[in-house]
Amino acid sequence: MGDSVLSAIQQTITQRKSANPSESYVAQLLHKGEDKILKKVIEEAGEVLMASKDKNPSHLVYEVADLWFHTMILLTHHDLKAEDVLDELARRQGLSGLVEKAARTES
């Protein structure tokens, strides 16, 4: 289910790249450029932190969804997709975090 939801959202965001900014929130963000998108990602990340401190699971889920959505817009701005992140996560699956970190510091 998760992949299909992310794929559908990704498809919509990608379509909004060519939409009229006066008719779409996503098109507005993409039209305004990277700095505006980054400000929104920072704002949403802060809201995730606050929701975590609130100890309210449903509020945390809501805010993480906002953060994911806005990072997907950022990815689209860079002609990347959520699938690229999922591929990276799949690559890391089964790797020890400590081993992976050590490999990064050696190179």
Swiss-Prot record:
Record's keyword annotation contains Lipid biosynthesis: no
Reactions that this protein is recorded to catalyse: 1-(5-phospho-beta-D-ribosyl)-ATP + H2O = 1-(5-phospho-beta-D-ribosyl)-5'-AMP + diphosphate + H(+)
Gene Ontology biological process terms from the UniProt entry: L-histidine biosynthetic process
A single Gene Ontology CC term: cytoplasm
Localization annotation: Cytoplasm
First-tier enzyme category under EC: hydrolase
Pathway note: Amino-acid biosynthesis; L-histidine biosynthesis; L-histidine from 5-phospho-alpha-D-ribose 1-diphosphate: step 2/9
SUPFAM superfamilies found in the cross-reference section: all-alpha NTP pyrophosphatases (SSF101386)
This protein's record includes keyword Magnesium: no
Molecular function, one GO term: ATP binding
Protein EC: 3.6.1.31
Main localization (coarse): cytoplasm
Keywords assigned: Amino-acid biosynthesis, ATP-binding, Cytoplasm, Histidine biosynthesis, Hydrolase, Nucleotide-binding
Gene3D superfamilies per record: MazG-like (1.10.287.1080)
Matching InterPro entries: HisE, PRib-ATP_PPHydrolase-like
Family assignment from sequence similarity: Belongs to the PRA-PH family.
Protein name in the entry: Phosphoribosyl-ATP pyrophosphatase
Gene source species: Neisseria meningitidis serogroup B (strain ATCC BAA-335 / MC58)
